[in-house]
Amino acid sequence: MSNPRILIVGPPGAGKGTQSANLAEAYGVEHITTGDALRANKDMDISDMDTEYDTPREYMEAGDLVPDAVVNAIVDEALSQADGFVLDGYPRNLEQAEELEGMTALDVILSLDVSREELVDRLTGRRVCDDCGTNYHVEFNQPEEDGVCDECGGDLIQRDDDNEESVRNRLDVFDDNTAPVIDHYGDHDGFVAIDGEQTPDEVWSEIQDAVDAHTA
C-alpha cells in the first residue's frame, strides 16, 4: 500500500509529533494535526452548526474550546483532501473516535506507551525556542550553547504549561478523555502498541516495522 492511513495516539510528551513527521516523510503522506487543521480553516463558515460563533477563528481568539462538531467537520475536510495521512491529536474522546469511523478507514493505529513519571520528566524539562519553535530538553536534547537555539539563535524558554503542576493536570485530562480512545481501538486489526520509552531511533524502527507489516 503506497499511501497508508495512519493514526498515532499517546499522551502529551510521548513523541507523537516527532514520529508523525518521520512517517510523513518516509511514506509520502500528509501529517494532519488538529491544531494545523483548525488554523488552516479558521475562517470556515460554521454559522449553520448552531454554534456560539460563526468561525473557528472567533473561538480561538476568545480562548474558548472549539466544539466537537466544528473540529469533526474540519478534520473530515482535511482527510478528504489527503492521499494517505498520519493523523496526530485527534480523536481526543470517544465521541470523536466514533465520528472518525464515519470519515475514513484506518490501516494502522500506533499507540505510544510511556509511563507517567517519564512523561513528567520529559515535559517539565522541555525548552522551546521563543522565535522558531524548535524543541530542546535540559537532559537529552541540549543546545550547543545553553539557553540559545541552534537553529536561529533565539532564546529558549519553558512554556507556561510545562511546569509540573500543569503537566500533571494535562496528563489527568488525557487519562480521563483520551485514554479510553486507545482502549476503543485495542481490537482493531491494525492496532500496535509501541514502547515509547526507547530512544527515538528505536521507536522509529519499531514503527516502521509495524506500518510495513500492516500495509504490505
Curated annotation (Swiss-Prot):
Gene Ontology terms: cellular component:
cytoplasm
Q: Where does Zn(2+) bind?
A: C129, C132, C149, C152
Record-annotated residues binding AMP?
Answer: T34, R39, D64, L65, V66, G89, Y90, P91, R92, Q96, R159, R170
GO MF terms listed in the record are: adenylate kinase activity; ATP binding; zinc ion binding
Q: Which domain of life is it from?
A: Archaea
Top enzyme category: transferase
Q: Does the keyword Transmembrane helix apply?
A: no
Known catalytic reactions: AMP + ATP = 2 ADP
Signal peptide positions are none
Q: Which InterPro entries match?
A: Adenyl_kin_sub, Adenylat/UMP-CMP_kin, Adenylat_kinase_CS, Adenylate_kinase_lid-dom, P-loop_NTPase
Binding positions for ATP per the UniProt entry: G13, A14, G15, K16, G17, T18, R126, Q198
Q: What does this gene product do?
A: Catalyzes the reversible transfer of the terminal phosphate group between ATP and AMP. Plays an important role in cellular energy homeostasis and in adenine nucleotide metabolism.
Domain description: Consists of three domains, a large central CORE domain and two small peripheral domains, NMPbind and LID, which undergo movements during catalysis. The LID domain closes over the site of phosphoryl transfer upon ATP binding. Assembling and dissambling the active center during each catalytic cycle provides an effective means to prevent ATP hydrolysis. Some bacteria have evolved a zinc-coordinating structure that stabilizes the LID domain.
Query: Subunit structure, per the record?
Result: Monomer.
Cross-referenced PANTHER family: NUCLEOTIDE KINASE (PTHR23359)
Q: What is this protein called in UniProt? A: Adenylate kinase
- Organism listed in the record: Haloarcula marismortui (strain ATCC 43049 / DSM 3752 / JCM 8966 / VKM B-1809) (Halobacterium marismortui)
